[in-house]
């Protein structure tokens, strides 16, 4: 029997879009009999309680509103598949036999340690908006989707673990350029902003949590390396508390330089990418919303000059 896929699908306030996504799963799958969908809907979202898919079994969880990490964790705990695929209700699968392509990756790694991700037609190879893991990897990580992540950064969290694993001598990241799962997000001009997007805000949260879990991710990478070598795995530390990030611009940039560019446990291109992303988010949060300030307008004008060194560094992988 083929390895079974479990799709984790938290959704809120978008029954039509969720069912559009489910139709794309049914239409594009080579082996729908070996796919299950774990659907999480909030108690106070009755319009979504009846979301279903005739072609593929749907395991429905109706519960309280949770963090994004909590939603994915709840779905993962109910899943039974060999391959775990966290997806969003604002995505559409575009590639026929997409599940076969994922199973082919799964079969390449007898020890089950890998992170695969498709092309979302936006981020490309830069980071995994859909981080696909084996159940074996999830079990080694213990908490693959930490509940402390309220909104974003779970994708960065997992990618960072595997970048650290790469420095430890094991490159287990697989980018599936020809497998397209399109992200239909307003940010990319592919959808209208709805109540669910407005609830999360123009910039997701999680910067502080991501930075605070740096040491945790290093231990997680060491656990995966130990699993590959069939050696005893180190224990994971407590998640701890998210640090308070500097508000002062100079202190913030200095902090990100120290945290990311000076971190020899991750590849140089990934250090540059994280520094650029977190620094940009600092200035966007502070100066773009709710109304663009002069500092934002100045930085926007200087952006091409500021970005090119990091884009250059990121080419060296």
Where are these regions (language model features)?
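Short, acidic, metal-binding catalytic loop of nucleotide-sugar glycosyltransferases
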Residues: 20-34
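N-proximal low-complexity "stem/linker" segments adjacent to membrane-targeting elements
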Residues: 1-24
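Short beta-strand/loop segment that forms part of the nucleotide-sugar
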Residues: 33-44, 61-63
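C-terminal catalytic/acceptor-binding lobe
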Residues: 156-317
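Cell-envelope/extracellular polymer assembly enzymes that use nucleotide-activated donors
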Residues: 4-6, 36, 157
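Conserved donor NDP-sugar-binding/catalytic core segment of glycosyltransferases
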Residues: 91-130, 167, 171
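Active-site nucleotide-sugar/metal-binding loop of Leloir-type enzymes
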Residues: 73-83
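Short beta-strand-to-loop acidic/aromatic patch adjacent to the donor-nucleotide binding site
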Residues: 81-92
């Amino acid at each position: 029997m083929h390895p079974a896929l479990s799709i984790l699908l938290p959704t809120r306030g978008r029954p039509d879009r969720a069912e559009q996504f489910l139709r794309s799963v049914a239409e594009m799958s080579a082996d729908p009999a070996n796919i299950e969908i774990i659907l999480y809907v909030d108690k106070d979202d009755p319009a979504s309680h009846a979301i279903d898919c005739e072609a593929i079994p749907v395991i429905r969880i109706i519960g309280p509103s949770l963090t994004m990490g909590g939603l994915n964790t709840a779905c993962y705990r109910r899943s039974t598949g060999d391959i775990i695929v966290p997806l969003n209700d604002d995505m559409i699968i575009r590639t026929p036999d997409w599940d076969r392509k994922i199973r082919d990756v799964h079969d390449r790694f007898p020890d089950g340690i890998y992170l695969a991700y498709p092309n979302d037609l936006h981020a490309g190879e830069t980071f995994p908006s859909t981080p696909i893991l084996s159940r074996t990897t999830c079990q080694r990580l213990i908490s693959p989707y930490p509940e402390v992540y309220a909104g974003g950064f779970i994708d960065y969290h997992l990618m960072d673990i595997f970048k650290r694993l790469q420095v430890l001598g094991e490159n287990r990241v697989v980018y599936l350029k020809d497998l397209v799962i399109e992200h239909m997000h307003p940010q990319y001009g592919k959808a209208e902003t709805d109540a669910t997007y407005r609830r999360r805000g123009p910039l997701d949260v999680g910067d502080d949590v991501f930075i605070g879990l740096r040491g945790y991710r290093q231990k997680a990478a060491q656990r995966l390396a130990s699993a590959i070598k069939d050696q005893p795995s180190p224990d994971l530390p407590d998640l701890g508390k998210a640090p308070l990030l500097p508000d002062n611009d100079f202190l913030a940039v200095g902090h990100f330089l120290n945290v990311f560019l000076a971190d020899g446990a991750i590849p140089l291109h990934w250090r540059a990418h994280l520094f650029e992303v977190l620094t940009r988010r600092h200035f966007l949060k502070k100066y773009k919303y709710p109304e663009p300030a002069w500092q934002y307008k100045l930085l926007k004008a200087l952006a091409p000059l500021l970005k090119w060194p990091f884009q250059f560094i990121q080419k060296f992988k």
